[in-house]
Regions:
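Catalytic cores of nucleic-acid endonucleases
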Residues: 2, 58-109
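Active-site metal-binding core of divalent-cation-utilizing nuclease and nuclease-like domains
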Residues: 24-51
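Active-site donor-binding loop signature of nucleotide-sugar glycosyltransferases
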Residues: 34, 56-58, 117
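Conserved catalytic cores of phosphodiester-cleaving nucleases, focusing on short active-site segments
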Residues: 41-64, 77
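Short, low-complexity, polybasic intrinsically disordered segments
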Residues: 104-124
Length: 124
């Protein structure tokens, strides 16, 4: 059980670092650990009219971080994003013109790395 709590704390730290990275680059954090009927979104962020669904992973490099987001999880995140878009009030003032799925991985040194538009719901 202690290992589970330790992993949970490490995951929360990674998400906090990811949110800080986003804020420092002009993104507004709309939600963290947003629960939807389709699943949880780690971070929902907005910059201008762009909305980003951000998945956060603790991994040593980009390759292993990308591999950690399996196709089933990508589909769940796409359904969760659809749910968010249908509920519009969580998006703040003004409409959204774009939606993308980003990946932020936090390496062994605790440094967050941002991969914008990491995947698309159609599998590309």
């Amino acid at each position: 059980m202690a290992r589970g709590r330790s992993s949970e704390r490490a995951g929360r730290r990674a998400e906090a670092l990811a949110a800080l990275r986003l804020r420092l680059t002009g993104w507004r954090i709309l939600a963290r650990r947003l629960k939807t009927p389709a699943g949880e979104i780690d971070i929902l962020a907005r910059r201008g009219r762009m909305l980003a669904v951000v998945e956060v992973k603790r991994r040593p490099d980009r390759a292993t971080a990308g591999e950690a987001v399996l196709p089933a999880q990508r589909r769940r995140l796409a359904r969760a994003a659809d749910w968010v878009l249908a509920r519009g009030e969580t998006l703040g003032a003004g409409g959204v013109e774009g939606l993308r799925f980003d990946l932020i991985w936090v390496d062994r040194l605790g440094l967050p790395h941002h991969l914008p538009d990491a995947w698309r719901p159609d599998g590309s």
